Amino acid sequence: MEAMGEWSNNLGGMYTYATEEADFMNQLLASYDHPGTGSSSGAAASGDHQGLYWNLGSHHNHLSLVSEAGSFCFSQESSSYSAGNSGYYTVVPPTVEENQNETMDFGMEDVTINTNSYLVGEETSECDVEKYSSGKTLMPLETVVENHDDEESLLQSEISVTTTKSLTGSKKRSRATSTDKNKRARVNKRAQKNVEMSGDNNEGEEEEGETKLKKRKNGAMMSRQNSSTTFCTEEESNCADQDGGGEDSSSKEDDPSKALNLNGKTRASRGAATDPQSLYARKRRERINERLRILQNLVPNGTKVDISTMLEEAVHYVKFLQLQIKLLSSDDLWMYAPIAFNGMDIGLSSPR
C-alpha cells in the first residue's frame, strides 16, 4: 500500500502532460494483468487523449486516471464523479480488505461519506452522491446539526407550553375553588336568612290566629250577654233594662275596662272591680244566665238558635199548658183536652 501511495503521489506531482503520462502508464502497466480479464493490457486511448482511462488494480490497491473531459465511477455503480478543470487528476479510494478466496470488489454500499465535495488540484469539483443500494440517504453534517437543533428547540417549546398550561390550569382551579367556596357561603347565608324570615312569618301568623280566635270568642260572649233577657215580671224587666242602660252608658263613658274586654283582654288581669255598679252588673248577668239554662231545659224540642225564638216558643208552650189545665179542671170540657193537646183549635181561647 505504501508503494501504491508513492506511485499515486509521483503521478500526481510529476506528470502534468497527457502524452508523458500515457507513455509512462503503458510501460508501467505492461507487466500487470487486468483484474477482470487476467491478461496484461494497457489502456484505451484516443488520438487526442480525451478518452484516456487507466485502471491499476490489485488485491489491496485501486488507481484510476481520468482525462480532462472524462469521468469515472466506482464499482457496482455506487457513486459518480465529474471534473471540470484542466489537467489530469488521480483519485485513490479507501482500502478494502478482502478474503483470500474472493476477488477484490470495491463497493460503496458499506461506506458512508457525509461530504458532498472534494478539493482536487487548483479548483473545486462537486460530487453528487446519490442514494446507495441499501436505501440510505446521505445528508451533510450541517443540515443534520441544524435539524437536531430544530428538534431540541421544538422540544423545549413544547415543554414550556405544557408547563405554562399546567400553571394556568392550577391557577384556574384555585380560582374556581375559591369562587365555589364564596358561592356556597352566600347560599348558606341566604338559606339562614330565609329560615329566619319564615320563622318570623310563622310566629306572626300564629299570633294573628290566636288574636282572631280570642276576638271571636269575646264577640260571641258579648252577643250572648247583649241578647240575654230576664224572665221576670214587666216591672223587674223594665227596671233591669233601665239599670242596664244606665250602667252601659256610664260604663262606656267612665269605665275603660269594657273597651279592654272588647280587645280580648280579661278583667282579672287588672284585678276585680269593687265599685257597686260593677258588682250589681255582675250579679245581674249571673241571674240571666241561670234563667236561660232553665228556659233551654223547659221547652221540649226547642230550637235553641237565638234567645228571641227561644222566648217565643216558651210563651206558646206556657199558653198551651194553661189551656190544658183549664180543660182538665172543668167537668164539661175535660174530653176536649186530648184534641187541644194535638194542636187542634177548638175555639177556646186561653185565659189571659
Swiss-Prot record:
Region described as Basic motif: spans on this chain: 272-285
Tissue-specific expression: Expressed in roots. Expressed in root epidermal hair cells.
Swiss-Prot/TrEMBL induction comment: Induced by jasmonate (JA) treatment. Induced by low phosphate conditions.
Biased composition, class Polar residues, residue ranges: 160-169, 223-232
Tree of life domain: Eukaryota
Subcellular location: Nucleus
InterPro entries per the UniProt record, alphabetical: bHLH_dom, HLH_DNA-bd_sf, IND-like
One term under GO cellular component: nucleus
Transmembrane helix recorded as keyword: no
Residue runs in coiled coils: none
Domain (bHLH): residue spans on this chain: 272-321
Phenotypic effect of disruption: Reduced length of root hairs.
GO MF: DNA binding; DNA-binding transcription factor activity; protein dimerization activity
Record keywords, A-Z: DNA-binding, Nucleus, Transcription, Transcription regulation
Function: Transcription factor involved in the regulation of root hair elongation. Does not seem to be a direct transcriptional target of RHD6 and RSL1. Involved in the regulation of root hair elongation in response to low phosphate.
Subunit structure: Homodimer.
Protein name: Transcription factor RSL2
Originating organism: Arabidopsis thaliana
Lineage: Eukaryota, Viridiplantae, Streptophyta, Embryophyta, Tracheophyta
Underlying gene: RSL2
